[in-house]
Design a protein with these regions (language model features):
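Beta-sheet entry/capping signal
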Residues: 1, 35-36
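Generic structural "secondary-structure junction" signal
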Residues: 6-9, 26-30
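Alpha-helical scaffolding within the catalytic cores
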Residues: 19-26, 33, 120
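C-terminal, flexible cofactor-proximal segment of oxidoreductases
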Residues: 37-172
Length: 172
């Protein structure tokens, strides 16, 4: 549940944790007041790249590079995404949904190129690893969607890595 005690009731986002909150055009712009922007309100598979794409989209809305459509078009767009989200049945579909959402935001701005298909593939692998073993899924290594380089596997299994200091991380 999101909590915004500093906002007037008329502009508070009221929703449970979901992939596409209603009342937010492109998941960012408050439907009834286009000067109010919310970032990161979605349940997340994509985190930083989604936040970045949202921020670049918000920047372009503020700067007037992205023109807001009519109220009817905004409503149709929100309803389309909410309806698609409500039909999702499993994590793979949820990953596909959020990948498509993030790609759409990406394509609306000049955000640098990123390999969303590789990200989609990695998230699905990660989700299956999590189902296979909740204690070891974090011990996997993936390639960067920007550089393609593969991260080394961490020297200590996640379950037993109790010292998360930089010194321990870098010295083992």
């Amino acid at each position: 549940m999101h909590h915004f005690p500093f906002l007037d009731e008329s502009i508070k986002l009221k929703t449970h944790n979901r992939l596409y909150p209603p009342k937010l055009y492109k998941g960012v712009v408050w439907q009834d007041n286009h000067k109010l922007l919310y970032l990161g309100m979605q349940d997340q598979f994509h985190t930083f790249n989604m936040f970045d794409c949202q921020a670049w989209f918000a920047r372009d809305v503020i700067m007037g590079k992205i023109k807001m459509p009519s109220a009817d078009e905004i409503n149709k767009d929100i309803n389309k995404w909410v309806a698609m989200e409500e039909k999702l049945e499993n994590p793979d579909q949820m990953i596909d949904f959020q990948t498509e959402y993030t790609k759409e935001l990406h394509d609306m701005s000049d955000y640098p190129k990123i390999d969303f298909e590789l990200i989609r593939k990695h998230f699905k692998e990660w989700e299956h690893h999590k189902v296979e073993d909740i204690l070891t899924y974090r011990n996997k290594s993936f390639s960067s969607p920007v550089t393609g380089s593969v991260a080394p596997i961490h020297h200590t299994p996640w379950e037993t890595a109790m010292d998360d200091s930089m010194k321990t991380f870098l010295n083992k």
